[in-house]
UniProtKB/Swiss-Prot annotation:
Entry protein name: Plexin-C1
Gene Ontology, cellular component aspect: cerebellar climbing fiber to Purkinje cell synapse; membrane
Organism: Mus musculus
Protein's cellular compartments: Membrane
Domain Sema: 35-452
Modification Phosphoserine occurs at: S984
Reported tissue expression: Detected on dendritic cells, skin Langerhans cells and neutrophils (at protein level).
Ranges of the Cytoplasmic topological domain: 972-1574
Bilayer topology term: Single-pass type I membrane protein
InterPro entries: Ig-like_fold, IPT_dom, Plexin, Plexin-C1_Sema, Plexin_cytoplasmic_RasGAP_dom, Plexin_RBD, Plexin_repeat, PSI
């Protein structure tokens, strides 16, 4: 909205805005500096905010936590507390418009341990989720895993309160969280209830140790509520003088009312909860009911003062608000501490419990500092230049600034920022931790960084320093009022004058008559003695009058001789200092007209005391009669008597004359809301107004500001009088009327509100005749004077029309005026007039009146008529209230037609209305009639549609049929011939394509050679820890971080007795085997549970592999017993038992070294070669199908023609890769059908191959730019030039799309914008596989039309064979590295387990050799090698694409076929995946049999050799995993089936001791469970 300050349009004339009003509007614009300040907008309402000294600003909104930089322009990281990865609020109950402090989903946001030597800063967060969960995370990045977490620390209710502070206890290195929370409160039935543990239901304040490990924390103490205390709402927590203070107030969450007085609880800053009492706070001054709500809190530690915002309203609206609803009260902490030693009435204290009804005296605030305001919401206090500064937020979006005087007296607040939307300010104001010139202002969903002062609005030095703002000072080099940091050369003390200097110290040039024949020009003010020069010139002629240089310890001064200078009227004086200049222009033309001594001397003229007149400074006067001192001159003027007439109205204290006492009565004041511009006609109603001679209105707003006294404008009659109220800031004021100096009678409250703001005009289009209902949406419409439509006539003349309107606070309704005299199509401006100011509200478009083409009357039943009126299509939004339809029948009969709906068709719009409850409807429908339509001001009669005669129709029908038949025969014959011709062309094209593809496929098989890179650098092996976890938990990524906790940094004293006992119990073989068998017999012990249990057991026994191997032997024998009676060949084939998964894990542990040393390199070469072959041809980005593949299902047979394009790629030099040895100009081959993303990948791979090291940036951090001469164009997968196919499908851009030719130069550059992750395109995009649509054929042209349509998949099956040939040698090398024996020795694990299987077969008297072969195959190739072959990401630090996965599945199947004893009978119809390696399988089978035989023929391993090998492996993996976590997970299964296990132990002999140990372990765990942590 723009505020128009012109005088108004010429017709009709309006009075111009008065000068004071314009000055006020300029003053209002001063806080608008914040309009350009950075703002962060979140998806949900902000619930918490905190600033770190090194890691930015943290903002919690909904279920998200954002880490922002200090400028709020960039988000550094984001944490989603919602598992779905969004920021939605988790309950259906929306928070109120003004939530109480702490009433949100984010309860705590506490950075701590910042700046501690050698320690990383941490962030403690508390949420309502997970029963009031807390997390501790590193401050640097929210995406890192939480270090510690726990539940039931904060309130789990969105409306419940929580306040906390983290501190380091004296004498220790431990950090503690002191937290106060509302754990229990009644909630509506629709809310998600959360019930804390019984021990927490009466807890008010608790102390937690933040250093405890995950799931092993301990509560250090608590302070409980008294039984009669009710709910407490905690607002803040802070440290002072060795104690922790918690401001709070008793609150009934059901009724929404405070039940007691605000208080402050105090505990010791210690390692346990030591209650030190509580103190009640009194901030009731100026409010009859008292202020029982505490809205905000701030400790001003530098002066030991605590500031609080208190309120008497609930904050849920304006219905109970008054000018004295809220107040800022300041308390001395020493007094609070003294009163806190009294008895306690809200908490269960061991001493000093209050008796029932006994309430101690409340602490009184500092009276001079109390500030009463209608709507404060927040406070933050600090000390600047020994001045206490308080920032206050308001409910209408203002940020106020209060500077306390030396005796702590509050001044009138300055408005330093206003939020345009008037959103209530959040209860917490956060200062910038690094720059004290900014403060973070939170409101609704937004956070703004606001300067703490508007220094620049003060234009002169005296104005700057007189404002007494400690943040501002006068910058001499810039000659502006600035922050000290914004002043050039501010490091020099003399260049920046702060408020301690005072306005009298401002530098100023003075011209003084010193002697009869000489006038001195000098400079006064706070100027230290330094080198300076001064020059005085005649401004009219430029003649030099005098000049000088500074003498020692004196500033420059020069003397002007008087006699030659009588005729000089304008003088320019300039003083030059080393870093700044001061110039001033003196005009002596009007000296004689100045009647006051101070004004005379201030202008440079001379005051002659003898004659008491102002003279030209060079005019002679007796020397003793010159007055040179402006201050003495000012004192002399003040002592002289002055006329008291005019000026402000002074309140008369005289008494009324004797006689009858006249009673004056005030009833009301109208309106009760006016804009900040004031109002010239405010009416006060009452009685006996004409009996008073002196009537004034007194307005009292903020208590520390001056009140306004306004004399009555006009007494209309005995009951009505009119006042003209001045402009003011936004606030609510008390109004009282004073008659003849008597008592001021209250007239109620008056609200100054912001100017109206328009957001929407509905509808925005109307017809030229007008009369349509128009609604304007916005806010503050209840203060407008009238609404104006301004439009332009022919000849560019403007006409303003006042329209009648009905306005409420949020909308205005009016009828569009008739503009028949205007152009047919015109836009008019809608304006609001407030006082003499015009506000633009938007435009309303006028179009030509609607055109009605006819109507039809139909009757389906005899008591109802339907009238359908046809209208040309237009852009009018016609509603039921806009239209009135009447049907006339006969001479005097008329019927009102009830509007039903409007239907818009392609050609016409139909308006349907109905006439109900009539007689003879059919007769009326068939007789003569007419219809009148009134649309706003438009009234017209609609003609009835003409209906063709049935007779003519019957004649024309046979002729039309004959024509149609002839045309159909001709068209059919033509179409038949055309179809035959097209089919012949398409068959020829198909034959040609088949011949070409067969020949190309044959040539490729014979000639193609893949240039495999022999030197692919270091193989990127994963370390053992991650290899093991990926094989142990292939589908559960959530265990990685808890098992990989750094075990070296754990405290040796932090051992858990319960886990130690469980570890000892598991090492009992009989007990462990019994537990496993018992668990497997439970029906709900699923296959997933068996696999997880086996993996947890492997980790727990990672350093006891000898023992683990013995367990494996026992369980394997037991499994053989089960299978031998049924089908022995099926043993170990599936993973359905603990031992089968245990065997997989055991093989992974024991063969990790063999995998890394022998198999790893050929395996990595296979993956690299396969990937290189796939990328040699086209790959569809959307489906991942490729031309070169091993899997028919992933074959890209809809392949277009493609060509290789050689690019000259130039890599930009970046800080991440600044080596001089790096080659930055590289030739890269891409395909013209590659997307830009695929081209990036090939460019990255080329850089790695060329330089042996990566570029240094991620793929999504770079962009490609085509350079043609001096022009550059960024290449993107999707941009404005992308082809849009049928149904809105977008075709991704390719190299060919940009018409990039061989030798083109491509620049690789680092993106500046926020990086996004790799794009996964949806179904609305396509690449190479295109939709079968006409739009595609039009785009591609005739050359590709038939080819695309007649593609046949079988034409490209040779590509499978081509891919197989390319990788065949590498594949065979891999297979033989697996089933070969290096140095004629098998790995220990394989030899040991194969011998174990042979021995068991002999013991079982199994003579079938196939059974043992199958056992070995199921235990090694199937259980281990196939898992590795299909998942290279288990072994290497690489990303497996879906296409690579499909190819590796084919290779893995061929690998297993080599171990199969069954002969494959393949026919021509067999799957291609089987046929591809059909000829190779027999050879592989023979090699496998030789491999098995060679292992069997090797000498057996001794038990000593095997134990030594297992012991060495155990030592290798010490401290790799957090074994205590694994033991905890195992215990969860044991305790779940505790009764079954205990019953089994009771039945087994020899396990009595194990039974006792198990019971002991359970007792230890139960005791540990009682100790809770955050």
């Amino acid at each position: 909205m723009e505020v128009s300050r012109r005088k108004t349009p010429p017709r009709p004339p309006y009075p111009a805005a008065p000068l004071p009003l314009i000055a006020y509007l300029l003053a209002l614009a001063a806080p608008a500096r914040g309009a350009d300040e950075p703002v962060w907008r979140s998806e949900q309402a902000i619930g918490a905010i905190a600033a770190s000294r090194a890691d930015g600003v943290f903002v919690a909104s909904g279920s998200c936590l954002d880490q922002l930089d200090y400028s709020l322009k960039n988000r550094l990281s984001r944490l989603y507390r919602d598992q779905a990865g969004n920021c939605t609020e988790p309950v259906s109950l929306a928070p109120p418009a003004r939530p109480r402090p702490g009433s949100s989903f984010s309860k705590l946001l506490l950075p701590y341990r910042e700046g501690a030597t050698g320690l990383e800063g941490l962030l403690l967060t508390g949420w309502t989720f997970d029963r009031g969960a807390c997390e501790v995370r590193p401050l640097g990045n929210l995406n890192r895993s939480s270090l510690r977490n726990g539940t039931e620390v904060v309130s789990c209710h969105p409306q419940g309160s929580t306040a906390g502070v983290v501190y380091r206890a004296s004498g220790t290195d431990l950090w503690y969280l002191a937290v106060a929370a509302t754990y229990v409160l009644p909630e509506p039935e629709t809310a998600n209830r959360c019930n804390p543990a019984a021990s927490d239901r009466d807890t008010a304040i608790a102390l937690k140790n933040t250093e405890g490990r995950s799931l092993a924390t301990q509560e250090l103490g608590r302070l409980k509520l008294r039984g009669s205390a009710g709910s407490l709402h905690f607002v803040d927590a802070f440290l002072w003088n060795g104690s922790v203070y918690f401001p709070y107030y008793p609150y009934n969450y059901t009724s929404g009312a405070a039940t007691g007085w605000p208080s402050m609880a105090r505990i010791a800053q210690s390692t346990e909860v030591l209650f030190q009492g509580q103190a009640a706070l009194d901030c009731d001054h100026g409010h009859p009911e008292g202020r029982r709500l505490l809205l905000s809190s701030s400790l001003v530690e530098a002066v030991d003062i605590w500031a609080g915002v208190f309120s008497a309203a609930t904050g849920e609206g304006q219905e109970r608000r008054s000018p004295a609803t809220t107040a800022l009260c300041l308390f001395r902490m020493s007094e609070i501490q003294a009163h806190a030693r009294s008895c306690s009435w809200d908490f269960q204290a061991t001493e000093h419990n209050c008796k029932e009804g006994d309430r101690p005296e409340r602490v009184q605030p500092i009276a001079s500092s109390t500030l009463i305001h209608s709507d404060l919401t927040s406070v933050y206090g600090t000390v600047v230049m020994n001045r206490t500064v308080l920032f206050l937020g308001t409910g209408d979006g203002q940020l106020l600034k209060v500077v306390l005087g030396e005796n702590l007296t509050s001044n009138c607040p300055e408005v330093i920022y206003e939020i345009k939307e008037e959103t209530p300010v959040f209860y917490k104001l956060v200062p910038h931790p690094m720059k004290n010139i900014y403060i973070y202002l939170t409101a609704g969903k937004e956070v703004r960084r606001i300067p703490v002062a508007n220094c620049s609005k003060r234009k002169s030095c005296s104005e700057c320093l007189a404002a007494a703002d400690p943040h501002c000072g006068w910058c001499l080099p810039l000659q502006r009022c600035t922050f000290q940091g914004d002043c050039t050369h501010a490091g020099s003390f003399e260049n920046w004058l702060d408020i301690s200097s005072g306005p009298k110290k401002c530098p100023k040039i003075q011209i003084l008559r010193s002697l009869r024949e000489r006038t001195t020009v000098t400079i006064v003010g706070s100027i230290s003695a330094r080198h300076s020069e001064c020059v005085v010139k005649n401004a009219d002629t430029g003649k030099l009058l005098c000049q000088g240089r500074s003498q020692l310890n004196w500033t420059c001064a020069c003397n002007i001789p008087s006699r030659p200078s009588y005729n000089v009227l304008v003088v320019n004086a300039t003083f030059s200092f080393p870093s700044w200049n001061l110039s001033e222009r003196f005009n002596f033309t009007n000296c004689a007209s100045l009647k006051e001594c101070p004004a005379c001397i201030r202008s440079g003229c001379a005051w002659c005391k003898r004659d008491k007149k102002c003279i030209h400074p060079f005019t002679p006067c007796e020397p003793s009669d010159y007055e040179r001192n402006q201050e003495l001159c000012q004192v002399a003027v003040e002592k002289s008597p002055k006329d008291s007439g005019g000026g402000r109205v002074k309140e008369s204290k005289r008494n009324r004359t004797d006689g009858a006492v006249q009673v004056f009565y005030i009833k009301a004041i109208e309106p009760q809301k006016i804009s900040t511009l004031g109002k010239s006609n405010v009416i006060v109603t009452g009685a006996n107004f004409t009996q008073a001679s002196n009537i004034t209105m007194i307005l009292r707003g903020t208590s520390t500001c001056e009140r306004d006294v306004i004399r009555v404008s006009h007494v209309l009659n005995d009951t009505h009088m009119k006042f003209s109220l001045p402009s003011s800031r936004k606030e609510m004021k008390d109004v009282c009327i004073q008659f003849d100096g008597g008592t001021c009678s209250s007239a109620g409250a008056l609200s100054y509100i912001a100017l109206p703001h328009c957001s929407l005009i509905v509808p925005a289009t109307t017809w030229i005749s007008g009369g349509q209902n128009i609604t304007i949406m916005g806010r503050n419409f209840d203060v407008i004077d009238n609404l104006i439509i301004s439009h332009e006539l022919k000849g560019n003349a403007n006409v303003n029309i006042n329209v009648s309107e009905y306005c409420a606070a949020t909308f205005c309704r009016f009828l569009a005026p008739n503009l028949k005299s205007s152009k047919v199509r015109t836009n008019v401006a809608v304006k609001l007039r407030v006082q003499d100011t015009y506000l633009d509200c938007g435009t309303l478009q006028y179009l030509e009146d609607p055109r009605f083409t006819g109507y039809r009357v139909e009757s389906e039943i005899d008591t109802e008529l339907e009238v359908k009126i046809q209208k040309e299509n237009d852009n009018f939004n016609i509603s039921k209230d806009d239209i009135d339809i009447t049907l006339f029948h006969g001479e005097n009969k008329q019927f009102n037609c009830s509007f039903e709906n409007i239907t818009r068709n392609q050609d016409l719009t139909t308006i349907l209305c109905k006439i109900k409850s009539i007689k003879n409807a059919n007769t009326i429908a068939s007789s003569s009639k007419k219809v009148r339509v009134k649309l706003g001001n438009l009234e017209l009669y609609v003609e009835q549609e003409s209906v063709p005669s049935t007779w003519y129709f019957l004649i024309a029908l046979p002729i039309l049929l004959a024509i149609v038949i002839v045309v159909a025969v001709v068209v059919t014959r033509y179409k038949s011939k055309e179809l035959s011709r097209k089919q012949s062309q398409q068959l020829e094209l198909l034959e040609s394509e088949l011949r070409k593809e067969i020949r190309d496929g044959f040539a490729e098989l014979q000639m193609d050679k893949l240039d495999v890179v022999d030197s692919f650098g270091t193989v990127p092996f994963l370390d053992y820890k991650h290899f093991a976890l990926r094989t142990f938990f292939p589908e559960s990524g959530g265990f990685t971080h808890i098992f990989t906790e750094d075990m070296h940094n754990r405290d040796a004293n932090d051992k858990n007795e319960s886990l130690t006992a469980l570890d000892a119990l598991i090492c009992n073989k009989s007990f462990l085997v019994t537990v496993i068998h018992t668990l497997e017999k439970q029906k709900n012990f699923s296959v997933k549970d068996r696999c997880l249990f086996a993996s947890f057991l492997t980790i727990a026994l990672q350093t006891k592999l000898v023992y683990l191997t013995s367990i494996l032997e026992v369980l394997t024998r037991d499994l053989m017993e089960q299978c031998s009676n049924m089908q022995p060949k099926l043993m170990l084939r599936r993973t359905e038992s603990v031992v089968e998964k245990l065997l997989t894990n055991w093989m992974s542990v024991c063969l990790s070294g063999f995998l890394r040393e022998t198999v790893g390199e050929p395996f990595y070469l296979l993956v690299t070669t396969l990937n290189q072959k796939i990328n040699k041809g086209p790959v569809d980005v959307i489906t991942c199908k490729a031309l070169y593949t091993l899997n028919e299902d992933w074959l890209l047979w809809q392949v277009p023609e493609f060509n290789t394009v050689a690019l000259n790629v130039v890599f930009e030099k970046i800080p991440e890769n600044e080596s001089a040895d790096v080659c930055r100009n590289i030739s890269v081959n891409v395909l013209d059908c590659d997307t830009i993303g695929q081209a990036k990948e090939k460019v990255f791979q080329a850089f790695l191959s060329k330089n042996g090291s990566p570029y240094g940036l991620q793929l999504n951090e770079i962009g490609l730019e085509l350079q043609v001469g001096t022009r550059q164009k960024e290449l993107l997968d999707i941009d404005s030039s992308s082809v849009i196919l049928e149904d809105g499908i977008t075709k991704l851009n390719t190299i060919g799309h940009y018409e990039i030719s061989n030798g083109s130069t491509i620049k690789v550059f680092k993106k500046i914008a926020n990086f996004t992750s790799d794009v996964e395109y949806s179904d609305d995009h396509c690449h190479l596989i295109l939709p079968d649509s006409e739009a595609f054929q039009v785009v591609q042209g005739k050359r590709h039309r038939g080819k695309h349509k007649f593609k046949v998949k079988e034409m490209y099956l040779t590509k499978l064979l081509s891919t197989k040939v390319a990788i065949h040698s590498v594949l065979e090398k891999l297979f033989r590295s697996i089933w070969s024996l290096p140095n004629s020795r098998a790995p220990f694990a394989i030899k040991y387990f194969f011998d174990f299987l042979d021995a068991q077969a002999e013991n079982k008297k199994i003579t079938d050799p196939d059974v043992v072969h199958i056992w070995k195959t199921n235990s090694l190739p199937l259980r281990f090698w196939v898992n590795i072959l299909k998942n290279p990401q288990f072994v290497f630090d690489i990303k497996k694409t879906p296409h690579i996965d499909s190819c590796l599945s084919v290779i893995a199947q061929a690998f297993m076929d080599a171990f199969s004893l069954t002969e494959q009978q393949l026919g021509k119809e067999a799957p291609t995946n089987k046929l591809l390696y059909a000829k190779d399988i027999p050879t592989y089978k023979e090699e496998v049999k030789s491999y098995y035989k060679a292992i069997r023929d090797l000498p057996p391993l001794s038990s000593l050799e095997m134990e030594e090998f297992l012991t060495q492996e155990s030592k290798k993996h010490e401290n790799e995993f957090n074994e205590e976590v694994a033991l905890t997970e195992i215990y969860k299964y044991i305790v779940k089936y505790f009764d079954e296990i205990l019953n089994k132990l009771e039945r087994e002999r020899g396990l009595e001791e194990a039974q006792k140990q198990l019971l002991h372990v359970k007792v230890l765990f139960d005791e540990k469970k009682k100790c809770k942590w955050m």
